[in-house]
Swiss-Prot record:
It comes from the Bacteria. It comes from Lactococcus lactis subsp. lactis (strain IL1403). Its EC number is 5.3.2.-. The lineage of its organism: Bacteria, Bacillati, Bacillota, Bacilli, Lactobacillales. Coiled coil: none annotated. Keywords: Isomerase. This is Probable tautomerase LL0574.
Length: 61
């Protein structure tokens, strides 16, 4: 039972997340052979100031 964690800056709608989750689920099922009912997609919305790369804060675009 695969668990896929997706971390994005805040601001995506429920509809956008549903599309992303569906496409991730279909891809994992196709390439890993897992049944879609066993695949879990978990979203973590990051507020600005919570993601740093190379010591520099990443900003929403």
């Amino acid at each position: 039972m695969p668990y896929v964690h997706v971390e994005l800056f805040e601001g995506r709608t429920v509809e956008q997340k549903a599309i992303i989750a569906k496409e991730i689920t279909e891809s994992i099922s196709k390439h890993a052979g897992a049944p879609t009912s066993a695949i879990h997609v978990i979203f973590n919305d990051l507020p600005e100031g919570m993601l740093y790369q190379g010591g520099e804060m990443k900003k929403k675009k």
